[in-house]
């Protein structure tokens, strides 16, 4: 979406095939985050977690030391609010601007420039990146000037997403155990009050027997872990989140951590899941 909007895009990824694919579309490949940082005035980091964000910025080949003063760092991983707050302070000490900007929407919406972005940062940083956000997202929610506010909202989104996926899996598992036709059950629930966005989006993966990861089980092990760690510090109970977290942990422990998060349905005993279709995966 950035290339379509006319930006000069420099890209780095640990997977050469990913870089090559974007270069074919007109981007310029970089051999390291440091090399990339030396060529850009806005650095958009789309990685999985805090550790990867840290490595991109402050690792042996980190970008932070190469960015010019006044450059903007936009970090979009789902991380704890505390990490985002501390990151903002570290970047400010380097005279860099920071936007805490976790995203929602997945790879398809990212490619189409239709993501939702939950962002917090200074008005000056947003002003510099207005055209960039116009290119990558359909909805930009400006949630304040302090880093961490965007990550707090993303954390709550992930609480709901994880609980809804776990609930959808549990509902389908009980339906299969009860002898319901899986596709008929999906059709009825999709048009009834029990439906949710996650039910409508994830249950087709179960019906097709296709657990090719679009968002993996281990993502929700991480994200619900962030939710529970944050709540624990203020002695705040989250019984549904805790149960959903245990379900994803159980799926991961059984060897399904790298599969699509809908594979949490595989933890339920005594049911026969739909087999992979000809176009499906494993």
Identify the residue ranges that each predicted region occupies:
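NAD(P)+-binding Rossmann beta1-loop-alpha1 motif at the extreme N-terminus of oxidoreductases
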Residues: 1-46, 71, 110
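Hydrophobic beta-strand scaffold residues
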Residues: 9, 29, 97-99, 140, ...
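Rossmann-fold NAD(P) dinucleotide-binding segment
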Residues: 33-98
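Rossmann-fold dinucleotide-binding core
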Residues: 78-158
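Active-site-proximal catalytic alpha-helix in oxidoreductases
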Residues: 112-113, 117-119, 141, 147-178, ...
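Interdomain hinge/lid region at the active-site interface
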Residues: 151, 160, 195-257
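Beta-strand segments within the central parallel beta-sheet cores of soluble alpha/beta enzyme folds
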Residues: 181-191, 242-246
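NAD(P)-dependent dehydrogenase/reductase Rossmann-like domain
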Residues: 249, 253-282
């Amino acid at each position: 979406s950035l290339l379509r909007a006319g930006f000069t895009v420099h890209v780095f990824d640990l997977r050469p095939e990913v870089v090559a694919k974007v270069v074919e579309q007109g981007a310029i490949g970089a051999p390291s985050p440091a090399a990339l940082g030396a060529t850009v005035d806005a650095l958009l980091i789309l990685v999985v977690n805090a550790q990867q964000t840290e490595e991109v910025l402050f690792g042996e080949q980190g970008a932070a030391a190469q960015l010019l003063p006044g450059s903007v760092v936009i970090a979009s991983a789902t991380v704890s609010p505390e990490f985002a707050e501390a990151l903002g302070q570290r970047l400010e000490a380097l005279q860099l601007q920071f936007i805490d900007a976790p995203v929602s929407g997945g790879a398809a919406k990212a490619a189409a420039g239709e993501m939702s972005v939950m962002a917090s940062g200074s008005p000056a940083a947003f002003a510099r990146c207005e055209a960039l956000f116009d290119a990558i997202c359909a909805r930009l929610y400006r949630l304040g000037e302090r880093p961490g506010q965007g990550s707090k909202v993303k954390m709550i989104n992930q609480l709901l997403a994880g609980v809804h996926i776990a609930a959808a899996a549990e509902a389908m598992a009980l339906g299969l155990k009860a002898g319901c036709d899986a596709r008929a059950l999906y059709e009825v629930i999709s048009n009834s009050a029990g439906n949710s966005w996650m039910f409508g989006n994830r249950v087709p993966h179960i019906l097709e027997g296709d657990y090719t990861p679009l968002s993996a089980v281990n993502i929700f092990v991480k994200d619900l872990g962030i939710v529970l760690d944050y709540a624990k510090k203020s002695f705040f109970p989250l019984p549904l989140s805790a149960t959903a977290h245990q379900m994803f942990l159980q799926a991961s422990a059984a060897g399904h951590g790298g599969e699509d998060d809908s594979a949490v349905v595989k933890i339920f005993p005594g049911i026969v899941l739909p087999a992979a279709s000809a176009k499906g995966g494993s």
